[in-house]
C-alpha cells in the first residue's frame, strides 16, 4: 500500500514550477546520508485517489506541479496516480516523480512531465552538484530529455 507522511510546497525540486511535494514512505533504497531516513519506514496514511484529490483541491490554485517523493516500492501505484492526475486535471498540473531507482520505470513514459532517477550517493551529492549520479528528465516530444544541468546553475 502506498503511504504518504507529509507534504509541502517547494520551489527548487522542479525547474520553473511551484510544486506540491508529497513524501512517500517505505523507501527500499537505504541511501547512506539520506536526508529523510524516517521515509524508509512503513508509516503514514494511504495515498489513493481520494486522499490525492483532497490535497489537490486544497492547493490546486497555488501550485503548477505535483511531485511524488519516493514510492519506488510501489512504482506501479505511483504511475497510476500520476495518470489519475493527468486525466482528472486535464493537463492543468504537471506531474513529477523523484525516484531512487537508477533507471526510468517503464510505466513512467507519458505519465510524468519530470522524473528524477538515481539513489543519493553522499560522495557525489544531489542534483545541484556537477558530480551527481542523479539525473532529472523532462518529458518532451515523446521522450525524456536530461535537464540535470538546469539544476546546477
Regions found by a protein language model. Give the residues of each.
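Core AdoMet radical
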Residues: 36-48, 58-76, 91-104, 114-139
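Residues that flank catalytic or metal-binding motifs in active/ligand-binding sites
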Residues: 18, 111, 132
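N-terminal [4Fe-4S]-dependent radical SAM core
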Residues: 1-23, 28, 36-41
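Conserved, mostly hydrophobic/aromatic
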Residues: 22, 31, 115
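Surface-exposed amphipathic alpha-helices with a cationic face
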Residues: 79-91
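Charged phosphate-binding loop/patch that engages nucleotide di/tri-phosphates or the phosphate backbone
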Residues: 139-153
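Charged helix-capping and loop-helix junction motifs
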Residues: 48-52, 80-83
Amino acid at each position: 500500500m502506498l503511504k504518504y507522511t507529509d507534504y509541502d510546497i517547494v520551489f527548487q525540486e522542479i525547474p520553473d514550477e511551484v510544486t506540491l511535494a508529497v513524501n512517500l514512505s517505505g523507501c527500499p533504497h537505504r541511501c547512506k546520508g539520506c536526508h529523510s531516513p524516517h521515509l524508509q519506514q512503513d508509516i503514514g496514511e494511504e495515498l489513493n485517489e481520494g486522499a490525492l484529490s483532497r490535497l489537490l483541491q486544497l492547493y490546486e490554485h497555488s501550485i503548477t506541479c505535483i511531485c511524488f517523493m519516493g514510492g519506488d516500492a510501489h512504482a506501479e501505484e505511483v504511475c497510476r496516480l500520476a495518470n489519475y492526475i493527468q486525466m482528472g486535471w486535464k493537463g492543468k498540473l504537471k506531474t513529477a516523480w523523484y525516484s531512487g531507482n537508477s533507471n526510468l520505470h517503464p510505466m513512467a513514459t507519458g505519465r510524468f512531465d519530470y522524473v528524477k532517477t538515481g539513489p543519493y550517493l553522499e560522495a557525489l551529492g544531489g542534483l545541484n552538484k556537477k558530480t551527481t549520479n542523479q539525473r532529472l528528465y523532462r518529458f518532451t516530444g515523446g521522450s525524456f530529455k536530461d535537464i540535470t544541468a538546469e539544476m546546477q546553475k
